[in-house]
Amino acid sequence: MATPRPGAPGALRTAVLGGTGWLGRHVCELAARRGHHVLAVARRPRPHVAPHQFAELDLARASPESIGRLLREHRVDVVVNATDAANATDGWARTDEDLADLNLGLVRRLLAALGTVEKRVRLVHIGTMHEYGEVPAGTVMDEALHPRPVTPYTRSKLAGSQAVLAATRTGAADGLVLRVANVSGPHPSPESFPGKLVALLREAVATGDRMPVTLGDARRDFVDVRDVAEAVLKAVESTATGQAVNIGSGTAVDMPTLVRLFVTAAGYPAEILDERAQEVRSLGGAWTRADIQRAAHLLGWRPRTTLAESLRDMWWTDRAEHRPVVGR
């Protein structure tokens, strides 16, 4: 296992790019609880990042000079790049150029910015298990697997991760790439599959109708967003560098099982579902199951939240936020 950074877990000045997003907000919250100084960076502020220092920056267009200036002004020790072109605001309606601009272009500009900062700033870059591309069903996907992504999204994510790894291996940067499986848990991005499930069940509960859901035959690895945030913080506080690390549950679940588990974990009978089977558009491969041994050995990380707990908390967090106001 890699040793912690000198003084860790002391107070590190941690900038979270994409700090208002699904994963970013959980990283900000956990980093603050750990005693780190958090700087959330995003295009616009959101209420849930109010407890943290915030810097407004359009990362899709920010120059290396503006990023470097931000890092110097706030004396940042660690940058977490939690941005993703398939984000909560814009969804998946992106051109290939848009995907490349953020998933790769931002990484290149960020690496250039790190080179202008006098002190060594650590980088934890959030990639995706879908960078590996299509693999045969049953494959346990470890980091030795040669990536072969086929979609514009996954190719752009891989290119960003490879840029970070190349910089760390040449000594131009210090840090890790975390390749994260599909995510579940509280505050999902509206355009994500879990986010759409929450919206569909919310509508069904409000109207008394059945919950229509279109399902493909994919089997995916789902990991709770809070467990991912824990992995990110372990990477922040580690000295390990120059490696990709898979972050997942280590289990593949088929989509019908996932949906039924979500509904029953929320407290409703599976009969509420109106399931429709057909091919579903996806950003990644039809099978993912992460080998997470490197995360255990290098970072001392393992997932702690069951899928049922993750889906239950995802639903009840949403219910608390959308509870009708009595008397109005």
Where do the language-model regions lie?
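Conserved Rossmann-fold NAD(P)-dependent oxidoreductase catalytic core, especially the SDR/UDP-sugar
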Residues: N81, R108-V150
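NAD(P)H-binding glycine-rich loop region in Rossmannoid oxidoreductase-like domains
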Residues: L59-L102
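N-terminal Rossmann-fold cofactor-binding loop
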Residues: V41-P45
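Active-site helix of classical SDR
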Residues: S156
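Conserved catalytic-core motifs of eukaryotic protein kinase domains, centered on the activation segment
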Residues: T89-E97, E134-G138, S189
